[in-house]
A protein has these predicted regions:
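A glycine- and small/hydrophobic-rich beta-loop-beta segment
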Residues: 339, 351-451
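Extended C-terminal subregions enriched in glycine
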Residues: 451-452, 463-465
């Protein structure tokens, strides 16, 4: 590892890259463009693999974040990777070395047992797809200037009995925290008031029925947290809530996606709200009431001011069908294409919409792909149709006829291929779409390997040295459907220009068996790849030192929790919500 550190220093990488937010930046491009060590050539010609793992308490639903050159009291200056878990524990680990103990860790309170969600018609056909605890489900965000990390946790107060207990008396609160980067000391914390009222529903019930799944956003000297449903247990609505970044005072008013209506959650499969250079926010909503005159925006792209006023919106011509048939537009999040005015996003119907940020366009008047008389700028089918099965003959009953998009597109401007977006829909090939500023996207995809059976597709990041040496990294189930079950996962690396497979954890590391972390992309920084898992551990990959064996090191004994089943055959079928 010390030899590798010298290589990093020699290549100018040692202080290069921080990853402070989900998908690397406020545009949510998913690209790190200062990677000088990892390239298609080094992955082909050198020993790349798992270097070590660190054990944590709980599943990891949040993307790991990285800070370089951080002074830790009594432990020197370190590169640090931050991990938050579903047991409400936040960790700071040495990002480069397999140390058995974290630099610091802090518990934010007892998590909520999974079975505290009401089953009044909304528990996903009786299935719980988040279990056994619900704690930190969103990716935190880091303010390097203030030396703080912001984290939202779902907390049971007082501590609830274990998930196996029968009682439903479980006070629940959402709480936002700011922690000192160097020590984990809590600087501020504040209970979150989700401003929903309904007959017979207490504040604890409101917190219980909502899920803060989308990554946090730091912009405009504020921290923004978006909410959707937990298990679709009504009543619930979508919200964006802002907090002062210094004090965590909740700033009123919050934004509700469906005032006077219902649903319209912002979950985005964990992807965060995006923000432009003016501080405006962009989100995508799921199924819900749609009446623009009443400011109800189910299955809609929304542009919000820094003060959370709706500035503009776009809804597909089929918005009524999307809402009726559970074909969420907001099953992934928006991505702002760098150096353009365009925003890209898509949902369960497998389409990608390309919109102009300065004029989203309102309600689409037609839905023929070649109609240019009304917004969007472009839209096209970006996921393949279902195979010919009984389900495919009845698309109106089973989420329409195309495989769903869950991971937001990621973007890289290749010197060889030009601007390109990548996505990996469920049960589909990994795909690349090339962009021309005059004609927009070429709708014939460059396709790579096929994905797993069923939910949820692949979750992507791009590393590159500017416009060169691009690698597309993907976290995806190894084989089985991860709609409800915990299944084996794999990490794959592709040449970003050709989609040729360069490396795979299941092909090159036969002993690298871990549980897939649903909806979470890998983090790439400074020659390493940080992969969260549901096996209660963070895996760290990189180039092995010259002449070193490729045997991975474990920071401590890995969890033997019987809940981690390696690979388990998942539930079948296509009528899936998958909001977790």
């Amino acid at each position: 590892m010390r030899v590798l550190a010298l290589l990093l220093a020699a290549s100018g990488v040692a202080s290069a890259t921080d990853v402070l937010t989900h998908h690397n930046n406020l545009a949510r491009t998913g690209a790190v463009l200062e990677e000088k060590l990892l390239s298609p050539a080094t992955l082909k010609n050198q020993a790349f693999g798992r270097l070590f793992s660190v054990v944590v308490d709980g599943q990891i639903y949040a993307q790991p974040l990285v800070v370089t050159g951080l002074a830790i009291p009594g432990k020197g200056t370190r590169n640090v990777v931050f991990v938050a878990t579903m047991r409400n524990v936040v960790y700071a680990f040495d990002a480069d070395n397999a140390e058995p103990e974290p630099l610091w860790h802090v518990s934010l309170g007892a998590p909520m047992p999974y079975d505290r969600i009401p089953k009044d018609g909304g528990a996903l056909l009786g299935q719980y797809n988040v279990r056994p605890y619900i704690g930190v489900t969103s990716t935190p965000v880091i303010d390097r200037e203030r030396q703080l990390i912001y984290v939202v946790a779902k907390i049971a107060e007082p501590q609830c009995p274990g998930a196996e207990a029968a009682t439903a008396a479980c006070p629940v609160v959402y709480r936002i925290h700011s922690l000192a980067l160097s020590t984990g000391t809590i600087a501020h914390r504040s209970d979150i008031r989700i401003p929903m009222t309904a007959p017979g529903i207490s504040a604890a019930d409101v917190a219980r029925r909502h899920l803060q799944r989308a990554a946090l956003l730091l912009a405009n000297n504020r921290v923004y947290a978006a909410f959707g449903s937990h298990q679709d247990a009504p009543p619930w609505q979508g919200f964006v809530i802002a907090f002062d970044a210094e004090t965590l005072h909740q700033i009123e008013p919050a934004f509700c996606t469906t005032p006077g209506g219902e649903m319209g959650g912002i979950w985005q499969a964990g992807n965060g709200p995006a923000a432009d250079d003016q501080g405006n926010l962009y989100v995508m909503t799921g199924n819900g009431s749609f009446d623009p005159g009443a400011k109800q925006f189910g299955s809609t792209f929304l542009k919000l001011s820094p003060g959370l006023t709706a500035l503009d919106w776009f809804a597909p011509a089929t918005v009524g069908d999307l809402n009726l048939l559970d074909i969420d537009l907001g099953s992934s999040g928006p991505m702002l294409m760098s150096d353009t005015e365009e925003i890209v996003g898509g949902g369960k119907d497998g389409k990608l919409f390309v919109l102009q940020r300065s004029k989203l366009g309102g309600l689409q008047q037609h839905h023929w792909p070649h109609d240019r008389l009304s917004p969007p700028v472009q839209f096209f089918q970006a996921a393949r149709p279902w195979r010919i099965t009984l389900l495919s003959w009845f698309p109106f009953l089973f989420n329409a006829g195309y495989h769903h998009n869950h991971g937001s597109p990621v973007y890289w401007n290749s010197r060889l291929k030009g601007p390109t977006i990548y996505l990996w829909p469920e049960e589909d090939n990994v795909r690349a779409y090339h962009y021309d500023e005059r004609t927009r996207f070429k709708t014939k995809a460059l396709k790579g390997m096929m994905g797993n059976k069923g939910m949820p597709g692949g979750f992507l990041s791009v590393s590159a040295n500017g416009q060169d040496d691009g690698i597309l990294w993907a976290a995806i189930p190894y084989m089985d459907d991860a709609w409800v079950e915990i299944v084996r996962g794999t990490l794959r690396a592709f040449d970003a220009n050709t989609l040729q497979l360069l490396w795979s954890s299941d092909g090159n590391e036969p002993a690298d068996n871990f549980d897939f972390a649903k909806y979470v992309p890998p983090t790439v920084a400074n020659g390493k790849v940080y992969l969260p898992t549901f096996s209660d551990r963070l895996n760290v990959y990189g180039l092995h030192a010259p002449n070193a064996t490729a045997t991975p090191k474990a920071a401590s004994n890995l969890s033997k929790d019987p809940r981690h089943r390696g690979h388990v055959k998942g539930a079948s079928g296509h009528a899936r919500h998958g909001k977790n």
